[in-house]
Design a protein with these regions (language model features):
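HKD-type phospholipase D/PLD-like phosphodiesterase module
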Residues: 3-34, 38-183
Length: 183
C-alpha cells in the first residue's frame, strides 16, 4: 500500500492474539456498515470459531462482510463453516483456490499473505497475526510471536482503497464458491 504522509492518525500496537483478537472482535461487533477481512490462515479452532461467530453476527445485523483467504494457507475450512457464513450473506473468496495438475499443487509460490481488516472505512488492522490459537500465549512454548496495529484516521481510506482495488469481483467469488461446494 503506497500512502502519502497524513496527519491525524492514531496507531495502537497489538502484541500477539492476546491483544489483537479482543480488539478486532470488539471492533467488528461495533461495525455499522462494512467489514473487509484478508488473511493467509484461518483455522477452525477456538480463535477461528470466535471470528466466525462475530462475522456471522455482523452479517445477520445487515453489515456487508467480505472475506478473502489464501487457498493454500487456509485449505481445510469445512463446507459447513464457510456455508453458514455465505448463507448469511458473507462474500467469501479464496485467492488462487488450489489449482492442481495431476493431483499436485501448481501454485506453491503464488500466495496472498496479507493480514488486513477494514471496518466501516474508519478503522483498520494490519499486521502479521493469522486466525489460529497458535497466536495465543496459552498455546504454550510453540505459540507464535507476532504483532499487528490498529489504525484510525485518514490513512484508513488509503488502506480501504487498496482493498477495493485488490478484491476479486463479488459475483465471481459467489460462483466459485458454488462450484467448490458442489465438487
Amino acid at each position: 500500500v503506497k500512502c502519502r504522509w497524513q496527519e491525524g492518525n492514531r496507531i495502537t500496537l497489538l502484541e500477539n492474539g492476546d491483544q489483537y483478537y479482543p480488539a478486532l472482535f470488539a471492533a467488528i461487533g461495533r461495525a455499522s456498515r462494512r467489514v473487509i477481512l484478508e488473511s493467509f490462515i484461518w483455522f477452525e479452532d477456538e480463535v477461528g470459531r470466535r471470528l466466525h461467530a462475530v462475522l456471522l453476527e455482523a452479517a445477520r445485523r445487515g453489515i456487508q462482510v467480505e472475506v478473502l483467504l489464501d487457498g493454500y494457507g487456509s485449505p481445510d475450512l469445512s463446507d459447513e463453516f464457510v456455508g453458514e457464513l455465505t448463507a448469511a450473506g458473507v462474500i467469501f473468496r479464496y485467492y488462487d483456490p488450489r489449482p492442481k495438475l495431476m493431483g499436485m499443487r501448481t501454485n506453491l509460490f503464488r500466495r496472498m499473505h496479507r493480514k488486513i481488516v477494514v471496518i466501516d472505512d474508519t478503522t483498520a488492522f494490519v499486521g502479521g497475526i493469522n486466525y489460529s490459537a497458535e497466536h495465543m500465549s496459552d498455546y504454550g512454548p510453540e505459540a507464535k510471536q507476532d504483532y499487528a496495529v490498529q489504525v484510525e484516521g485518514p490513512v484508513v481510506l488509503d488502506i480501504l482503497q487498496f482493498e477495493l482495488e485488490n478484491l476479486p469481483n463479488s459475483e465471481t467469488a459467489r460462483r466459485w464458491w458454488r462450484r467448490r461446494r458442489h465438487q
